[in-house]
């Protein structure tokens, strides 16, 4: 059984609730809102209703009877007194005007306050410019354009040749190809412009043996293992480059220093060629580890095979010869052998 104040929430039998009202209607609807007319106007409307009730023969009605008659009158929509105005009055408190389709004002292409044209989408600009498609306002400027605009001066100065550079090249007898410019581009204006062009034959090293079964390019060390570049050590399975350029001179200098050290009596200056050929791998790959462990496994298996006892294979002829030599006079062993073997 529910307990509580029986008069709360607009109960019919309670003191706070009004008789004849729905108890589920909240208080902010049942109570009179603040935006209604003044008490004088309400009293005038009640007197008019009372006069109408006396004419109809019902007699004068009290305030409770009026509330019981229509207690939600302040939320009812009433037609406006002006015909065909498209308005609706809410108990004369305020008037909301909803214009019809014919009377609605069309939007102008110009703003009346600022007198400026409205920005519209330009399909031609959007189709021609990819950056404009990224933004709903076609005035979008990406960051890359600002970067190119700021660095445009240094880029063009590198490609263009001024008069001082031309005179210096003529004095030294150099060509634009020697400096890194392309001479095939036609000259335009007082300044000679050359764009550096990469040769088509200049191909990446890892693309040279794509169709071959053996890959000569090492992605770890980024070395192309060709015979011209170096050799592969059969012991360590590592690639050793041939010494070229300054490395050859360094080797000659080291040899002279070693000879001078030996003459002066320094005996610790010894050279081990095996250590020089050794390559230290800071992070060996799985293939390198497998190549190192494979000979060790072969040695272990060979040692195990040598240590295991060998089993002799049975041979009929050898058995006959041994049996005849051990006991030549006995024929029973021979008969048994012929019978069961």
UniProtKB/Swiss-Prot annotation:
The biased composition feature labelled Low complexity covers 42-57, 320-331
Source organism, top-level taxon: Eukaryota
Q: Which GO molecular-function terms appear in the entry?
A: pre-mRNA 3'-splice site binding
Location in the cell reads: Nucleus
- Tell me if Nucleus is a UniProt keyword of this record: yes
- InterPro entries membership: Slu7_dom (IPR021715), Splicing_factor_SLU7 (IPR039974)
Explain the purpose of this protein. Answer: Involved in pre-mRNA splicing.
Protein name from the UniProt record: Pre-mRNA-splicing factor SLU7
Query: What gene name is given for the protein in this entry?
Result: SLU7
């Amino acid at each position: 059984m529910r307990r509580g104040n029986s008069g709360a929430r607009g109960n019919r039998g309670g003191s706070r609730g009004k008789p004849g009202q729905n108890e589920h209607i909240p208080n902010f609807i049942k109570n009179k809102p603040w935006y209604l007319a003044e008490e004088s106007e309400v009293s005038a409307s009640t007197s008019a209703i009372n006069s109408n009730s006396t004419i109809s023969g019902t007699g004068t009605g009290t305030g409770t009877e009026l509330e019981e008659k229509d207690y939600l009158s302040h939320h009812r929509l009433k037609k406006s007194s002006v015909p065909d105005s498209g308005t609706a009055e809410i108990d004369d408190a305020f008037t909301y005007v909803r214009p019809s389709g014919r009377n609605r004002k069309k939007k102008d292409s110009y703003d009346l306050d600022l007198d400026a044209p409205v920005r519209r989408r330009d399909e031609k600009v959007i189709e021609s410019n990819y950056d404009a498609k990224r933004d709903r306002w076609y005035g979008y400027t990406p960051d890359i354009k600002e970067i190119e605009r700021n660095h445009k001066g240094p880029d063009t100065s590198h490609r263009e040749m001024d008069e001082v550079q031309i005179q210096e090249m003529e004095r030294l007898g150099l060509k634009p190809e020697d400096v890194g410019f392309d001479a095939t581009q036609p000259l335009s204006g007082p300044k000679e412009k050359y764009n550096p062009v990469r040769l088509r034959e200049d191909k990446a090293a890892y693309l040279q043996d794509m169709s071959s079964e053996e890959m000569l390019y090492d992605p770890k060390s980024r070395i192309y293992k060709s015979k011209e570049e170096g050799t592969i050590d059969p012991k360590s399975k590592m690639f050793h480059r041939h010494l070229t350029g300054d490395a050859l001179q360094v080797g000659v200098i080291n040899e002279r220093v070693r000879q001078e050290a030996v003459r002066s009596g320094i005996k610790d200056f010894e050279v081990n060629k095996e250590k020089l050929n050794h390559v230290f791998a800071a992070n060996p790959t799985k293939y390198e580890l497998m190549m190192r462990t494979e000979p060790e496994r072969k040695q272990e298996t060979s040692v195990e095979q040598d240590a295991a006892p060998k089993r002799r294979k049975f041979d009929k002829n050898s058995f006959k010869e041994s049996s005849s030599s051990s006991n030549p006079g006995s024929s029973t062993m021979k008969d048994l052998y012929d019978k069961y073997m």
